[in-house]
Amino acid sequence: MSNVLEEMKTRRSIRKFKPDAIPQEILDQIIEAGTYAANGRGAQNVIIIQVTNKEKRDEIAKKNAEIMGSEGDPFYGAPAMLIVLGKKDWPTHVYDGSLVMGNLMLAAHDLGIGSCWIHRAKEEFESSWGRELLASLGIEDEYEGIGHCALGYVDGDYPDVIPRKRKPRILYQIGRNCKRRTMGKCWK
């Protein structure tokens, strides 16, 4: 099995992080991997905002928790986060941003960093608070929040791989090597 396939199978969402800072060199590698995600027509319209400033990270966590209706830390104590946003006027921005998120999480796992996709970025950046945050960074185009990639060193044991609930199967297959599969259709 290639390393990529192994990383895909063993990566887990981490929900307990150590407070230790991640070296910038490692964050740079994770971000670079995100920029290599497939994207519609090669437009590369997704942006990544790195947040390692604790005060700003805590402010974002508070806003995210408010949206969720909670008072806890939705980022599970992660000392760093990468916020992924897609340009709203691009038809594939949600898909493109989702692929970036996947690359970020796989790269983090490969580099020994835990990660977790945290939702509610869309709601954050639709708010006046979120638009002001983007403006403070000089981001003036219309962007939609896709997700937050919470990053940090795992606090405790790395979670075990959970067996899949079902075996993979092809429900429909078109081609000359087509063989009927359970509950599937086959056209030659």
Language-model segments: residues:
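Acidic, surface-exposed loops and disordered segments
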Residues: M1-K188
